Amino acid sequence: MRLPCLKACLPILALTLACSDSTSPTELVSGTYVLETVNGQGIPAIFSAGPADTSFMLSATLSLDGAGHGLRSEHWRYVFPPNQVQEGTFTMPVEYRIDGDNITVGSFQPCPANALCEGNKVGKFTSTTLSLSYETTSTTPVFLYRLSPTM
């Protein structure tokens, strides 16, 4: 009696396993993303502007591996009175977490006492884009990254 039941259940089990998705969520977003726009403005773009100073995002990349780790690199220019300009590149290792089509990029460790820590970026991803903004404020810029084609 058990053998016919086993024979009937094995094909169902095999079909179920064959149809399951073996791609983990982190593998879905792995790759190098290139910043395309900030608040819909093409790069270089104004990142923030005050009465006397302006910050520009000149370029940026976000490289994510399939294990929840990545590297963020941003090249910026800061203009302030009287006609002063500073330019630099900010590079930082990051982690990321995925929940459905939502992604959080940054650090998941507590900020050390007396340290200046940047908040995480949160957003959505598709098969070719990441749309991110800082999670701590509603007036933050929106950064749109596009997946760079692999060579």
Where are these regions (language model features)?
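Bacterial N-terminal signal peptides that target proteins for export
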Residues: 1-9
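C-terminal motif of bacterial Sec signal peptides marking the signal peptidase cleavage site
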Residues: 15-18
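Lipid interaction determinants
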Residues: 20-93, 97-151
